[in-house]
Amino acid sequence: MPPFDDVCVLVPTYNEAETIGDVVAEFRDAGFDDVLVVDGGSDDDTPAVAEAEGARVVSQSGSGKGQAVREAVREHVACDYVLMLDGDATYSVDDAEEMLDPLLAGDAEHVIGNRFADLREGAMTRFNQFGNRLINRGFALVHGENVTDILSGYRAFTRESFLKMTLSADGFGIETEMAVECAKRGIDTAVVPITYHPRPSGSDTNLRPVRDGGIIFLELYRRAKTNNPLFYFGSLGVLSTVSGLGIAAYVLVEWLTRGISHEVMAVVSGFGIIVGVQLLMFGVLADLVLTLHRDT
């Protein structure tokens, strides 16, 4: 593999002392001179191990993977291209050249490594596989793009395209935000197959599947407000309308069968129906405005 002089290998870390040394050494040996490790206040020797293997190590000013990536690219990366991966040795340097090829050829501005193309045994639990596929389908439904593996931590992108994005997630939601921003801003995105390895024994994951999965789903939905307003406001409108109709049906049955009137519940049902219809109309209008804006 030839050296990539204008590529920065970005590795956000937190308590990865068991694996970061091998990760840095592999990329340095492969010809990547600029390996940047952004450490989030590890309790172990992660920074020292990374530095000993030749990495450039900085301590992030905040906390969380998302904040680390934003700070690194904006303040510590001077290269035109960034290759981002986790420091847990689950991603291979053997896939690096294929990740970077679409960028260097000018065919894409953002590249996602598809872990499901070669998912090694033990690399991901069945529960996590189910959650990943569910989130990918949700992304395709809400944002109209099928990129196969939006949660992949192996990314390659131009620094210029990254600076176009509006990012705010501090934790693992950074990958989701980046995928949404690519879809929203029309950033050319390529997906390449990669190998995803199990974590080496003795290393612990920082991922909390239920908590982080919930955060990612909320982020997907929140981002739909500006990227797919018809879905965002429409789903709220349908929920409000259906709730109002359900309450109205109960009030009507009670009045017809038992002669009991529920004035307050009737008002609530009417309010729910009116709000729901207004949200649906607002969603249609917002979607029309967004379409006109994209066409200009």
Q: What residues fall within each predicted segment?
A:
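A conserved acidic beta->alpha catalytic loop
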Residues: D39-P47
